[in-house]
Amino acid sequence: PNHARSWAKVMQAHGFSMTPEEAYMHEGRTGDDTINIISKREGRDVGTEERKKIYQEKTEVFNLCPVISPMEGSAELLHKVMEDGLFAMLVTGSGQPSLLERLNNDFPDSFIRERMITSFDVKMGKPNPEPYLTALEKGGLKPFETIVIENAPLGVEAAHTAGLFTIAVNTGPLPDSVLLDAGANILY
């Protein structure tokens, strides 16, 4: 919710129309892609410097949000994965150091940089499958060796398009059908 509220607040401050629900539909995209889509829809040209400013402001607003506790059971799941000799990879459309630091604080030793795919590692963000295909390559994995856990429709679509078994977890304001329609194999 913090992510979506931050995007909506900053985009509205810059004169764009965006609700938290719409922002959630863009979760997983790179910041540039999100800004470009909204600005084009509204017939505005946003240059590189303005995009950087908007994203920086969004990051600042996000960093002021209250810290949310990890989803119940997530730490235990990651621990079990590692205990069984497997490993987790993180695929995120974000490049915010503060978000990545929060993940490392909440899930110590679960995500190492070599197993993270961020906005800095790809040219095309979600819903393009590139982030997940990059994770497969970086992890030396085949599609049948993976299970994706995703909370955003664009992430579900990207994983599904990459041919990966996808469990959707509805953590937002959207109806379950949005995640299922995006290609989730299972909804939690």
What do the PLM-derived regions correspond to, one by one?
Residues 186-188:
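Short acidic-hydrophobic, aromatic-tinged amphipathic segments that line or gate anion-handling sites
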Residues 63-90, 96-97:
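Short, acidic loop-to-helix structural element flanking the phosphoryl-transfer center
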Residues 1-22, 83:
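Active-site neighborhood of HAD-like aspartate-dependent phosphohydrolases
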Residues 27-62, 80:
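A metal-dependent, Asp-based hydrolase signature
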Residues 163-165:
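Structural loop-to-beta junction motif characteristic of Rossmann-like glycosyltransferase folds
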Residues 70, 88, 148-149, 168:
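Conserved SAM-binding loop
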Residues 95-147, 153-157, 161, 176-180:
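Substrate-recognition "cap/lid" segment bordering the active-site pocket of phosphatases
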Residues 13-16, 43-49, 107-112, 140:
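Short helix-capping segments at alpha-helix termini
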